Each structure stands twice: as structure tokens, then as C-alpha cells.
Amino acid sequence: MIDRLEKEVDMLERHLEVLRMVIESEPIGIVKMSNETGYPHHKVRYSLRVLEEENLIEPSSQGAITTERTEEFVEELDEKVDEIIDKLESMKIETED
């Protein structure tokens, strides 16, 4: 049960790392992202596809670039992460020692 959550968090972390690279270095291509992150090309490509489906990046002839929606998403991200952390904290089962 927890394994699936961990895998989702790892994948989200990768997607956000790819997004951060696009924001900082746009336009940027798959090969450069793969070389800098150590992620295989197919994983970078998948993250780019997910980010494109969310309208956070778009392809260009020079590589991935941000969209108008990217800034709004980034501004809301920290708040959403904090909400998730609070929810996870409330799920802990305390045991007596």
C-alpha cells in the first residue's frame, strides 16, 4: 500500500525536477536533461509528456519551453505540498512504547 505512494512521490519528484530544469534553462532538450539529471531518456521523455499534458510546458524546435500556466502552477505548488504533508501527518498511527 505504501509502496505505491512512494513510487508516485518519486515520479512526481522527477516531473518537478524536469519542470525546474525547463524553467531555469528553457529551451532545453531531452539529451541535456538526461545528462544533467542522470535519468534515462525515456523517463525524461515521459515526464515531458506529462508536463505537456498539464499545459506546463510545450515543445519548440529548440527544446521544451514553459507556458503561461507554469508561473501560476509554481506559485500554488508549495501550498499544495504543505496541504499534502499535513494530510499525511494526520494519518500517522501513534503507538505507546
What are these regions (language model features)?
Residues 62-80:
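Basic, amphipathic "hinge/linker" alpha-helix immediately C-terminal to the N-terminal HTH DNA-binding motif
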Residues 1-18:
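Short alpha-helical segments that sit at the start of domains
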